[in-house]
């Protein structure tokens, strides 16, 4: 504990998480609601990973990226939801200093990884639709493996910088985090030391990790739309668009909820509003992604039917 708090002269050993709501009558309903969300999230994302692994016709870069996205969503929800569930059952939801920093680190890692995974998926769709004859060369095993590895490596680097400087931040007088998990801004609100460098890092990485993926996605879809419009057959246009529709939905939900959570003006963004919008970003989005891809993706639906039919005859 002391090692992790090196440089923190006012040694803090634990924090208190305020939780999502202080109303006693809401604790049990909220516990049941988020337990259900977590179970659906686990079943959906682990099910998607298993389905892709068992279905040979889904062994393509597109679905390997989807499998990686499901892994990220599963991990992201596991980092946040279990501790939130504890807050509904206890009056004082205590989290140790080291556990808080670990939660912050993994939350940032998987959040950043999701940004770049969605960008990589957009690039994959661009290659498949705009350069189909070169797809197997452009998206070879080495290429998409490098993209997936690069996503995680870069996410680890970014989160390490932010968490590392948070470890150097002093917390002397306040130890109640007005949130249901350890996030950057609620922790900085408790800091008793100068947080200028932390704020610069947050601004830099937030801009970088928003601008680069969004620019990649927008550029990819501009070329995709131009290519789709040049297709003469109506059936060809529909087929090309249908391969992108699920990804567009996932991107819209993820970035829409993220923007609503983190980009509101401070004058409009009370802590209560921040908690509510964070709930959607951290718990609902990981639950929705596998549902979107299973309900709206024809290949996934066919693979699921085959698996279920195989089970019937066993």
Swiss-Prot record:
Superkingdom as given in the UniProt entry: Eukaryota
Function: Odorant receptor.
Similarity comment: Belongs to the G-protein coupled receptor 1 family.
Gene3D superfamilies: Rhodopsin 7-helix transmembrane proteins
Topology within the bilayer: Multi-pass membrane protein
Residue numbers on the Extracellular membrane side: 1-31, 90-100, 168-184, 232-247
Transmembrane segments annotated in the record for this chain: 32-52, 69-89, 101-121, 147-167, 185-205, 211-231, 248-268
Cited Pfam families: 7tm_4
Record's keyword annotation contains S-adenosyl-L-methionine: no
Listed GO CC annotations: plasma membrane
Name this protein carries in UniProt: Olfactory receptor 8G18
InterPro entries with a match to the protein in the record: GPCR_Rhodpsn (IPR000276), GPCR_Rhodpsn_7TM (IPR017452), Olfact_rcpt (IPR000725)
Lineage of the species this protein comes from: Eukaryota, Metazoa, Chordata, Craniata, Vertebrata
Cytoplasmic side: 53-68, 122-146, 206-210, 269-314
Subcellular location per the Swiss-Prot or TrEMBL entry: Cell membrane
Record's keyword terms, sorted: Cell membrane, G-protein coupled receptor, Membrane, Olfaction, Receptor, Sensory transduction, Transducer, Transmembrane, Transmembrane helix
PROSITE patterns (alphabetical): G_PROTEIN_RECEP_F1_1, G_PROTEIN_RECEP_F1_2
GO molecular function, a single term: olfactory receptor activity
